[in-house]
């Protein structure tokens, strides 16, 4: 296990349902990003998750799988499994329900599992729609969810997820101020060095995903250089 995950400043999220060339994968893997997270919300299966893992594993970066559901969980050939619970949804399936179904599997490698407390804040994102997250909450409510996740539920990661749009830095700042032990992740809309540097002021780890597909690897490199 890569035990230094708490020190990662920049991680890159790759979607098994989207295509990258071999050259693009090589550039991403050698960009200076600290780790790769293999994750997506729609059309994610064990097969395409495993295929993406096989494409990137030769580069030696820490590999994390963040499954959308039990159907896309893999353990072989990866370092960690990030499992999200959505704090700001009233649909219990996304807090603990799907987790219960998954835990019926006797083959779970618990040593690789890292729980995440997701706070989803983009109502137009796939993750927002699928989970029924209440994305219109205030900064105070976000901070309260973050505090509960950290102090009460003891989640090791609190993840502010704007997924596809750039978020409010003040909300991220407030969330960071509310936690004492968890690592604060921020993901959403980071497509420039300036945005990466701004969110890195408040989050321990920034996540760059869509920019890889929408703006190219050059933009990813700029975000890495801004925070490393």
Curated annotation (Swiss-Prot):
One of its GO terms (molecular function) is phosphoglycerol geranylgeranyltransferase activity. Its EC number is 2.5.1.41. Mg(2+) binds at residues 15, 41. The keyword Ubl conjugation does not apply. It catalyses: sn-glycerol 1-phosphate + (2E,6E,10E)-geranylgeranyl diphosphate = sn-3-O-(geranylgeranyl)glycerol 1-phosphate + diphosphate. GO terms for cellular component: cytoplasm. Its cofactor is Mg(2+). InterPro entries: GGGP/HepGP_synthase_I, GGGP/HepGP_synthase_sf, GGGP_HepGP_synthase, GGGP_synthase_archaea. It is an enzyme of class 2 (transferase). GO terms for biological process: glycerophospholipid biosynthetic process. Pfam families: PcrB. Its main location: cytoplasm. It is found in: Cytoplasm. Pathway: Membrane lipid metabolism; glycerophospholipid metabolism. Sn-glycerol 1-phosphate binds at residues 13, 159-164, 189, 209-210. Belongs to the GGGP/HepGP synthase family. Group I subfamily. Prenyltransferase that catalyzes the transfer of the geranylgeranyl moiety of geranylgeranyl diphosphate (GGPP) to the C3 hydroxyl of sn-glycerol-1-phosphate (G1P). This reaction is the first ether-bond-formation step in the biosynthesis of archaeal membrane lipids. HAMAP family: GGGP_HepGP_synthase (MF_00112). This is Geranylgeranylglyceryl phosphate synthase. The lineage of its organism: Archaea, Methanobacteriati, Methanobacteriota, Stenosarchaea group, Methanomicrobia.
